[in-house]
A protein has these predicted regions:
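N-terminal nucleotide-binding beta1-loop-alpha1 segment
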Residues: 1-18, 48
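Short beta-strand segments
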Residues: 8-9, 51, 102-103, 129-133, ...
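Conserved core of the sugar-phosphate nucleotidyltransferase
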Residues: 57, 109-193
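Conserved alpha/beta core of the MobA/IspD/sugar-nucleotide pyrophosphorylase nucleotidyltransferase superfamily
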Residues: 169-267
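Structural signal for interior beta-strand "rungs" in well-ordered beta-sheet cores
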Residues: 253-421, 426-427
Length: 449
């Protein structure tokens, strides 16, 4: 079945109290609308049209970073969901198939649920509405059903007391033949409490014309929409619990999992150990058998099998750790490759650097990669030993099996097998410590009132 998707993303989100368009607020490092698009693309639709409104340019710029193959149309004046869908007409006028209407601020409806809707649509059904049962329906629209057929949807503001007692609620998601959709939209009016064009009004119109209308029922948590900061916080919690559970089910060990925060795209292998208070930013892959110790922050990095990171380490974008690498406490690595068996165990900054195999980077080593204008690269070879407190002023190359003495400042290449000593010669001034201390104390005494 040919399928088109319309994503409604025009809402101002007034209750978010934010300059940022509502659909661009993030869960686990990705905008709400990106979660929706990641799900619906599993349906392999022939066309995706996103209806924007408030902050249209921002939404378009952000979405195209994730999903370049979508079409945008702007709802210039917000006149309701029916009007928003109608804005997509020009982009779907020649489409023959089913159109699925979803919402950019409802991120938790699963691919399986959407697939169930399409499967129901294929069973000689003209329209399918996604619904859910709720013990506290509040402001949700109610579904009026008779003998298994959906008759109409009544918005809570327009419902009478009997209708408000109905537990079967509208999720907002509708799948309908494309031609029928726009034919029905021509007939809806704004004669309601909000003076808006409701998409839901097409249900009663379709029923009056003897079209077949069915419902698919999902679990209420799937339909969670984000309208306030509090709901956004709750959605983050829901997502984190879901992805933590998935990581454990796939063979990872999470210590105090409630303190571990994943990104939407984090990939965790089997037998990975993750300690408490670890934060994953976007773009992190951890291979099987790796260990992430407590209080680490990781983003845009790849950690290979058997490697260990932390505690208190930070891996920034562009970092690649090969097998059996050790990154220890208070180490920051950015845009660097650390090859198999190498160690950076403590108190170091490694930036724009490649480190060969089985090298040891001493405590306090700093790669001076930035001259105030440009970044420069450093190359450290295999089986290199850098003494503690070594500074490498990039660009510089350290050859295989070479060494630096403690406290060395490296400003030129070190050939293979050489020892570099780049510090001033120590001079001991006999008895000068006592003289200096007396001088300092006398100066302090003169300054004191």
């Amino acid at each position: 079945m040919e399928t088109a998707i319309i994503v409604l993303a025009a809402g101002m989100g007034k209750r978010m109290d934010s300059d940022l368009p509502k659909v661009l607020h993030e869960i686990a490092g990705a905008p709400l609308i990106t979660h929706v698009l990641n799900t619906v693309k599993n349906l392999e639709p022939q066309k995706v049209v996103i209806v924007t409104g408030h902050g249209a340019t921002e939404v378009e710029n952000k979405v195209t970073q994730f999903e370049p193959d979508v079409t945008f149309v702007k709802q210039k004046i917000q006149k309701g969901t029916g009007h928003a869908v109608n804005c997509a007409r020009s982009h779907l006028k020649d489409f023959k198939g089913s159109t699925l209407i979803v919402y950019g601020d409802v991120p938790f409806i699963t691919a399986d649920t959407y697939a169930d809707i399409l499967a129901m649509k294929e069973k000689n059904t003209d329209m399918v509405v996604l619904s859910f049962n709720s013990e506290n329906p509040n402001n949700y629209g109610r579904l009026i059903v008779d003998n298994g057929e959906l008759i109409r949807i009544i918005e809570a503001k327009d419902a009478n007391i009997d209708e408000l007692n109905i537990k079967l609620c509208n999720s907002g998601v509708i799948c309908v033949d494309n031609d029928l959709l726009f034919d029905l939209l021509n007939k809806i009016t704004n004669k309601n409490a909000n003076e808006e064009y409701y998409l839901t009004d097409i249900v009663a119109l379709a029923y009056a014309q003897n079209y077949s209308i069915k419902t698919v029922i999902c679990e209420e948590p799937e339909t969670l929409g984000i309208n306030t900061r509090l709901e956004l916080s709750h959605a983050e919690k829901v997502f984190q619990e879901k992805i933590r559970k998935l990581a454990v089910e796939n063979g990872a060990t999470l210590i105090q999992p409630e303190t571990i925060y994943f990104s939407y795209d984090t990939e965790i292998g089997r037998d990975v150990y993750i300690g408490p208070n670890v934060v994953f930013g976007p773009g992190v892959t951890v291979e099987s058998g790796a260990k992430i110790l407590p209080f680490c922050h990781l983003e845009g990095c790849h950690i290979s099998q058997g490697s260990q990171v932390g505690p208190f380490a930070r891996l920034r974008p562009g970092t690649e750790l090969s097998e059996n690498v050790r990154i220890g406490n208070f180490v920051e690595v950015k845009n660097s490759i650390v090859s198999q068996g190498s160690k950076v165990n403590h108190l170091s900054y490694i930036g724009d650097t490649s480190i060969g195999e089985n090298s040891n980077i001493g405590a306090g080593t700093i790669i001076c990669n930035y001259d105030g204008v440009n970044k420069h690269r450093t190359k450290i070879g295999d089986e290199v030993f850098l003494g503690s407190n070594t500074l490498l002023v990039a660009p510089v190359t350290v050859g295989n099996q070479s060494m630096t003495a403690t406290g060395t400042i490296v400003t030129k290449d070190i050939p293979q097998g050489d020892l570099a000593i780049g510090r001033t010669k120590q001079e001991n001034k006999t008895g000068y410590a006592n003289k200096l201390m007396k001088l300092l104390k006398s100066k302090k005494k003169r300054k004191d009132p």
